Amino acid sequence: MIILGIDEAGRGPLSGPVVAAGVILDQDKIIDGLADSKKLTEKKRQSLYQQIITHAKAYTIVEISPQQIDELNILQATLKAIHQVANNLERQFDKVLVDGNKLPNWDYNSEAIVKGDSKIIEISAASILAKVHRDNICLEHDRLYPQYGFAKHKGYPTKEHLENIKKYGVLDIHRKSYKPVQVLLNE
């Protein structure tokens, strides 16, 4: 049975896109060290990212913008990204396994698996692609807006990030529907 593993990264940050990735592994090419991306060092994630995109049978990465997140809400934006991942790889898999407890409304043979990123290697691989891709976007944001410190906090609502929004203002990459950003917009 050919499995498509899907995971997302970036639901909690105040800025940047939510990213979903899907991976179909080549059963003849074993990738050692696949695990939940949050449990790996940045260096290990980068190394595995390269191995996954080189050796996977197929993969895709989908971004949903902060503007779409604000329009839809984060849950619907995440489900939209997951659905788009499956559509991008349509007819290449027998079953979809998604990390978490919710599935989009679709006709695919699928299952949501809580903590799937630490149980299913296809989901682990997707977790790594989504996390590294999103972290790279944050590094680009840091290059464009160095005073905000995106390389450090990756958009999460740290004390430093909130202070920098207060000091320098809300950017287009910020999620205006998120309460901490709304509070700062209304000050």
Curated annotation (Swiss-Prot):
GO biological processes: DNA replication, removal of RNA primer; mismatch repair
State the protein's purpose. Endonuclease that specifically degrades the RNA of RNA-DNA hybrids.
What cofactors does this protein use? Mn(2+); Mg(2+)
Location in the cell: Cytoplasm
Pfam name, any one = RNase_HII
The protein in question is named Ribonuclease HII
Kindly report the protein's main subcellular placement as a broad class. cytoplasm
Gene this protein is translated from: rnhB
- All copies of the RNase H type-2 domain together span 1-187
Its UniProt entry gives the catalysed reaction(s) as: Endonucleolytic cleavage to 5'-phosphomonoester
Q: What class of enzyme is it?
A: hydrolase
Which keywords does this chain's UniProt record carry?
Cytoplasm, Endonuclease, Hydrolase, Manganese, Metal-binding, Nuclease
For the ligand (a divalent metal cation), the binding residues are 7-8, 99
UniProt keyword annotation of Secreted present: no
What does the record say about how the cofactor binds?
Answer: Manganese or magnesium. Binds 1 divalent metal ion per monomer in the absence of substrate. May bind a second metal ion after substrate binding.
Can you name one GO molecular function term for this protein? RNA binding
| InterPro entries (alphabetical) | RNase_HII (IPR022898), RNase_HII/HIII (IPR001352), RNase_HII/HIII_dom (IPR024567), RNaseH-like_sf (IPR012337), RNaseH_sf (IPR036397)
**According to its UniProt record, which protein family does this protein belong to?**
Belongs to the RNase HII family.
Q: Name one GO cellular component term.
A: ribonuclease H2 complex
